[in-house]
From Swiss-Prot:
Keyword line: Hydrolase
Superkingdom of origin organism: Bacteria
Pfam family, one: Metallophos
Protein name (Swiss-Prot/TrEMBL): Bis(5'-nucleosyl)-tetraphosphatase, symmetrical
GO MF annotations in UniProt: bis(5'-nucleosyl)-tetraphosphatase (symmetrical) activity; phosphatase activity
Gene: apaH
Its biological purpose: Hydrolyzes diadenosine 5',5'''-P1,P4-tetraphosphate to yield ADP.
Amino acid sequence: MAVYAVGDLQGCLDPLKCLLERVAFDPAKDRLWLVGDLVNRGPQSLETLRFLYAMRESVVSVLGNHDLHLLAVAHKSERLKKSDTLREILEAPDREPLLDWLRRLPLLHYDEQRKVALVHAGIPPQWSLEKARLRAAEVEQALRDDQRLPLFLDGMYGNEPAKWDKKLHGIDRLRVITNYFTRMRFCTEDGKLDLKSKEGLDTAPPGYAPWFSFPSRKTRGEKIIFGHWAALEGHCDEPGLFALDTGCVWGARMTLLNVDSGERLSCDCAEQRAPARPAATPA
């Protein structure tokens, strides 16, 4: 069995199919890992969800911020943005099974056999892998509970609190956990988030740095596959870390990683650009 991890799809199905064909992916025996942001801004969000749902037994995916945004819009907790390409999903006759599958995806997946973690944005430097798994489970439980889901989606948006505190409770607690796993790029050594800066490593505000760069990071030595940060262009120069968002939706490329061998393949995505790219890399 081969395990392949792929960076942010964002509704770009054709490049994914291109990569899977190149490795002769067989859903009967192989596994596809996805770092989240399955939908939005690309031209094939509905087709992408349908493709993944059809082979869901062979797919392991975590949730990204765009996936959570889709759930919020679907539950009327948020409005569609001008740049969203989600309307086809919302109007699809099969939207309910697709959205139900989506909300049951985890924020963090850990493969015990390979000792590899899969997340969308990252793990804050002050958390061990064990604590990260426990915190992710708190949000996952809210997403999967019919009564708690609307309350979570209503309160999910926002940049505060900017830092974890074990005394946090309710929606504030869930919001900061969600922001760590799905929106984080820069933070302080003790985990205070800056969610405004979205470009390359040299654009960190004073006192902030990429979440993975701190010598004291408690997941140092762990293998972590993540996406979200297209400006990294697939490089973070940290042993054991694999950055897979290579900006497909913005006209760059989609990247596939053989989890066992470390080999990477990329597919050009120049034709996938749906809206014009803004001046800054998107959240």
